Regions:
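N-acyltransferase acceptor-side catalytic subdomain
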Residues: 1-167
Length: 167
């Protein structure tokens, strides 16, 4: 649900919003200005360790290489493709999350076939929460492989105190 309109997308503003359960998304055409601050009444939340893997997805995991924070800008650019249905990632959003990445708050998980980026996701990590913002795939299951890799990363000794918000 939309709870506010306005403000900037500076890292401090965005982080404070996440700490209060909000995320930014423009309310204009294709996510354009003004920026809206959203807090869905119901959220899609995954608990690390609660994901099931099909046989076909297991095969996909074996054929793709996964990395973390290696191609953040490329992942965001692929997610921002204006030809994708529901496109909402503007240049301002890309710059904001790029700054959050440089500060260590935003992260990406990438899937590769050889040297070609075929899938990925990005989001923001605050406390025990990873808020997944967007994902893309250029090959079947590539974005699912990155989601599984993220869950594996979050599934450590603190897993019982972590949430993955998939909005």
């Amino acid at each position: 649900d939309l709870v506010a309109i306005g403000a900037d997308l500076r890292p401090g503003t965005v982080l404070e919003a996440y700490r209060h359960g909000l995320f930014p998304m423009g309310v204009g055409d294709l996510g354009g200005p003004p920026v809206g601050w959203w807090r869905p009444e119901e959220r899609g939340v995954l608990l690390p360790g609660a994901l099931r893997m099909t046989r076909s997805l297991r095969r996909s995991c074996r054929r793709l290489r996964v990395s973390v924070d290696l191609a953040f800008d490329d992942v965001v650019a692929a997610c921002a493709d204006p030809d994708r249905p529901g496109a909402w990632i503007t240049d301002d959003v890309r710059l904001s999350y790029g700054a959050l990445h440089l500060l260590g708050w935003a992260h990406s998980v990438e899937a590769w076939r050889d040297d070609r980026l075929v899938g990925g996701l990005y989001g923001v990590s605050v406390g025990g929460l990873f808020a997944g913002e967007s994902m893309f795939h250029r090959e079947r299951d590539a974005s699912k492989v990155t989601l599984l890799a993220l869950v594996d990363l979050l599934n450590d000794r603190y897993a019982d105190r972590r949430l993955l918000d998939v909005q």
